[in-house]
Amino acid sequence: NNFSSNLNRYPPQVSKELVEAIAKRYNLDRNKIILGNGSDELISILAQAFLGPDDECIYTEYGFLQFPQAIEIAGAVGVIAKDNHLTVNIDNIIAKITKKTKLIFLANANNPTGTFVPKEEIIRLHKSIPSDVLLVYDAAYSEFIIHPDYIDGSELVNNYENVIMLRTFSKMHGLASLRLGWGYCSNYILDNLMKVRGPFSVNMLAMI
């Protein structure tokens, strides 16, 4: 009854209860969590916030199809890093980094190839990235991986300002139609995303 009586009102910009629940579930800092209308909204606003004309954004050959779409909408230049036998090749990503590079989109684990990049390779990639380049670590399928060499990206976020981990309720939780995703990032990234994120992007039904 309480929910139905509030359907005539706009949803809150941030659901403190949901953020707290996510932070508790994954042992994260609640102040570094941002909600989105699916993680695809977060991908779009990352491109809007951090890319402009002539900027370059690297994405992998068989990564999420929304990566190049978000780059194009932002007016930036998409740079493809070739995979090796349907697996992300870290050396190919590093080789594509230039002075114009602003973002790197990386899905780990990756759909549709079903492959993942091990921890030591992710750490090597991050060490090769200039501090002003943002690594977007899409961990939408992290719950499907039980392997000692896999990391979901949260450890990198806790230690560095230029990483954002993306997660979703669409896959493991089977709630794709609710359009609910979230990101975990530094305050610097979060503040810039909030500047371009719509005030009512996540609906109330998704947040309860």
Q: Where are the language model's segments positioned?
A:
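Short, well-ordered alpha-helices that flank and scaffold nucleotide-derived cofactor binding pockets
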Residues: K24, Q48, G52, Q69-I73, ...
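Structural detector of well-ordered beta-strand residues that form the stable sheet scaffold
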Residues: I34, I58, V79, V136, ...
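PLP-dependent aminotransferase class I/II
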Residues: Q13-V14, N162-I208
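N-terminal small-domain helix-loop-helix segment of the aminotransferase-like
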Residues: N1-E41, I45
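PLP-dependent aminotransferase-like
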Residues: K16, A49-L106
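Active-site pre-lysine segment of PLP-dependent enzymes
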Residues: E72, I90-K99, P112-L135, A139-M172
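Short N-terminal helix/helix-N-cap motif within the alpha/beta-hydrolase-1
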Residues: G38, S44, Y62, G114, ...
